[in-house]
Amino acid sequence: MEAAVKEEISLEDEAVDKNIFRDCNKIAFYRRQKQWLSKKSTYQALLDSVTTDEDSTRFQIINEASKVPLLAEIYGIEGNIFRLKINEETPLKPRFEVPDVLTSKPSTVRLISCSGDTGSLILADGKGDLKCHITANPFKVDLVSEEEVVISINSLGQLYFEHLQILHKQRAAKENEEETSVDTSQENQEDLGLWEEKFGKFVDIKANGPSSIGLDFSLHGFEHLYGIPQHAESHQLKNTGDGDAYRLYNLDVYGYQIYDKMGIYGSVPYLLAHKLGRTIGIFWLNASETLVEINTEPAVEYTLTQMGPVAAKQKVRSRTHVHWMSESGIIDVFLLTGPTPSDVFKQYSHLTGTQAMPPLFSLGYHQCRWNYEDEQDVKAVDAGFDEHDIPYDAMWLDIEHTEGKRYFTWDKNRFPNPKRMQELLRSKKRKLVVISDPHIKIDPDYSVYVKAKDQGFFVKNQEGEDFEGVCWPGLSSYLDFTNPKVREWYSSLFAFPVYQGSTDILFLWNDMNEPSVFRGPEQTMQKNAIHHGNWEHRELHNIYGFYHQMATAEGLIKRSKGKERPFVLTRSFFAGSQKYGAVWTGDNTAEWSNLKISIPMLLTLSITGISFCGADIGGFIGNPETELLVRWYQAGAYQPFFRGHATMNTKRREPWLFGEEHTRLIREAIRERYGLLPYWYSLFYHAHVASQPVMRPLWVEFPDELKTFDMEDEYMLGSALLVHPVTEPKATTVDVFLPGSNEVWYDYKTFAHWEGGCTVKIPVALDTIPVFQRGGSVIPIKTTVGKSTGWMTESSYGLRVALSTKGSSVGELYLDDGHSFQYLHQKQFLHRKFSFCSSVLINSFADQRGHYPSKCVVEKILVLGFRKEPSSVTTHSSDGKDQPVAFTYCAKTSILSLEKLSLNIATDWEVRII
């Protein structure tokens, strides 16, 4: 039986025909809402029902056709956030509200009711800066800032709410017809998918009938929108037509098409909009299948017809309409009012949490393949990195390392002594990452399956039996991670006595957790499967992978008794997944177009909270040409998560297999990454404590520069580095836009400099990575690169001081032990600030709460843009001692180099240039 199952399941089960995925017009709730929207809005607010308390203002909304009352709640939340919830006032049964995503119950501010016109209500926050203008009939909400309308809700009358009904088809059809004015005659029942929906050979039986919701938002003056990952699409969201909405529905799409709005592995229902002077966000907290339509009306100027000799002209601001539609749940939306990009990032993280602080090793290079065959293969690949002087930090094992795809086991023939293998890696100060998927092989001799089944821990089918689907092990059941008891039990499986063969250098990779179900509808789980609390899968599909990663991260923390930071990579994700680890872009292809699309995909993830993200180097599917592989390593070295990976039917592609010259180029790219690790680690600390993305679109750093608003071929790392990867074959030049008319930019390798506010044609050879340091920044680097991050903890630092046009610079360094939670619990960290002004470089505390002893020294300082040759340079330490410093100066390049220094990184000191 085992052999037969293995023959049945192959790569082709995942490499499915794209026709098995639905487009919008094949989705019943989309068709229903689009059909209804041709009608006039029938919702009005009953302002005589208004009640207000410390938390919220509540009032009824009535559908004039069905007379079914809805309850609207408006909350003011600390930090300039408004929340709108709309639910049935008395539903037949509770409707699903997404739990566990918000870090806590948001802190509210009391809204003050102001007098409005007849038929309207005005609510203001305590400061009076923001106001909600509520119009009764038809129901509409305007969010006003400084007397300017920023967002209008339901201005197009697209509020849609299907109330729950009894399971009696004729009555249900009649009531739904009254509510929505949709033709629900018998011949139209099947097309509208009210009580059952057919797609291919699958029939989705809907026990609660239709339950979809929808609402429109008009963003005044905004034409540039971003967010709502995950799609293999441009960074700036595009206008959509009928049947062309952005789909948020987590799916296993092997070799996904690019520039396509179909949903792939993860969903973050969070959208940002930016214009000159303001950035805003809309967070639609719903975990069911969701579609988003976007339509921009450009600014127009028209003449008012009037009597008299002069016709007055009036300019109408552009506005963009965003229409959210979800299959089920309630309307629960947060409006983030900014006004700056940084403010919006903080507002969103206030709700969903910040990026988890990663262990330092995870910012190094990761080597993965489906699959490394056995312990000898792992040993040989590990030795290959040392032989070719290429640093790396983690070896990865895919599903073949297990016994027949039974997770938490080892193939005894291929990996007879996994602890010995891990001790080999430990001796090199490296780690091991293994895969653990959510499907559990149905096998009465597999202890994980038996224990989960005995305790009722699997997702159920409609009949209440364990749901069964096909995945890599063959017939499998799926753990119900929405159940807290399942998550607690699952996390216990990572304890060292339970997970035989594991050690404390073993970390985790969650894959196939959309969840992927081979031969299921759209390669996933039936929507009428049943979860904890008797909730249908349709209610929470997009949050399944979120819970899987949560449980895995908790397991790694528990095994160390709360002392060590976890590392967990997940393919599927939701809003808030940043709290638990990293995300990658899934099964990409070894094509230039996939290298190019990885940049906007990662930028979109980054601005929606998930800073720790990356794409498989070289493309997971197919065999990359050598030039493409080199360029991908160069791009990946400047992206947050840095992993090479390939599927099982590709040629081996370890970095030394492409000829000596290409090995050198890949080595240089990886070593550049390792040299910059102090800067990377400091950026992740800022993402963790201050909510600022590590990888940033240009518009985030230059919010008043229109040209940056739609750029996606270059980006910022933090505020100091601009990166423009080469993404075209046989390129000899790239056009790089250097923003900021008052900025100066320095080539990271050659130190050539340009004034900002212009496009520069940069020559590129195969060894060129176009990277530019922003004037006014100080970047900490390591002066030597070791075999892994573990070999570099005590190596010396260098500082790259790039002067601004005013001759000043500032930068930071964050340092801790790189692996534990002591930085959080015991304040064992070092946070230093470097500032250069008036020819003096000062090292001082950025945060005096932290203390972390370090013997590391600053050995070299490079000052770029120093305009005159010094007569002397001295260091001044906190004990009052002055020491002369040897220096070299190049008048042609304006570079001042200070070497052979020994300035302790943890103490205050100054470098004085005279």
From Swiss-Prot:
Give the source's domain of life in one word.
Eukaryota
Supply the InterPro entries for this chain.
Gal_mutarotase_sf_dom, Glyco_hydro_31_AS, Glyco_hydro_31_C, Glyco_hydro_31_N_dom, Glyco_hydro_31_TIM, Glyco_hydro_b, Glycoside_hydrolase_SF
**EC code(s) of this entry:** 3.2.1.20
Entries under CDD domains matching the protein: GH31_GANC_GANAB_alpha, GH31_N
Q: Does the keyword Cell membrane apply?
A: no
* Classification via Gene3D superfamilies: Glycosidases (3.20.20.80), glycosyl hydrolase (family 31) (2.60.40.1760), Golgi alpha-mannosidase II (2.60.40.1180)
GO process terms (BP): carbohydrate metabolic process; N-glycan processing
Question: Top-level EC class, please?
Answer: hydrolase
Q: What does this protein do?
A: Has alpha-glucosidase activity.
**Can you name this protein?**
Neutral alpha-glucosidase C
Organism in which the protein naturally occurs: Homo sapiens
